[in-house]
Design a protein with these regions (language model features):
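Acceptor/aglycone-binding surface of glycosyltransferases and processive sugar-polymer synthases
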Residues: 65-67, 71-81, 86, 98-164
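A conserved acidic beta->alpha catalytic loop
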Residues: 41-50, 94
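N-proximal low-complexity "stem/linker" segments adjacent to membrane-targeting elements
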Residues: 1-28
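Donor nucleotide-sugar binding loop of glycosyltransferases
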Residues: 15-18, 44, 71, 97
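Short beta-strand/loop segment that forms part of the nucleotide-sugar
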Residues: 23, 34-44, 63-64
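Alpha-helical transmission elements in cytosolic ATPase-linked domains
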Residues: 25, 47, 51-54, 77, ...
């Protein structure tokens, strides 16, 4: 069987109410591309795992951690499981728009880019607790690395799997 074009990796922790709407949103947004959805359950204590299993979606792969190891470990596990030519990373909290993925993939392919990174526009966190420190951190990272990504903290990214 031919591997999919995209592996969509979603690290989740206690995202039970978001699983069904997110999966539906992805399936409605990515229509002309072969893809798999890899949910990495990072030790959820709610019914996130059961919601993923109940999807009964042949595109879905579930990777389970027995306890919470954090997003970096979950992302690594998802990448290890991925079989797509490109990897998409996104959050499970419905703040990333899956309808951006086909456009981001097209940009990567047409422009020959290794990475296309999303930007959080309608963030649901507070200005002083999250947004301002994020702007400062993004500026420091840009200036110290010379890599100009507008929002390093945005999980929505598309990149070639051979770079992972």
């Amino acid at each position: 069987m031919k591997p999919p074009k995209l592996s969509v990796i979603i690290c989740v922790f206690n995202e039970e109410p978001n699983i069904r709407p997110l999966n539906k949103w992805i399936n409605e947004s990515i229509t002309d591309i072969e893809y798999e959805i890899i949910y990495v359950d990072d030790g959820s204590t709610d019914r996130t795992r059961q919601e993923i299993i109940a999807l009964n979606d042949p595109k879905v792969v579930l990777v389970e951690f027995r306890k919470n190891y954090g997003q970096s470990s979950a992302l690594y596990a998802g990448i290890e499981q991925a079989s797509g030519e490109y990897i998409v990373t996104m959050d499970g909290d419905l703040q990333n728009d899956p309808s951006d993925v086909p456009m981001m993939l097209k940009m990567a392919e047409d422009e020959g880019w290794d990475l296309v990174a999303g930007i959080r526009k309608n963030r649901q966190d507070g200005v002083f607790l999250r947004k301002l420190p994020s702007k400062i951190a993004n500026s420091i990272i840009r200036n110290s690395t010379g890599v100009h990504i507008k929002d390093y903290g945005c999980t929505l990214k598309v990149f070639k799997s051979d770079l992972a």
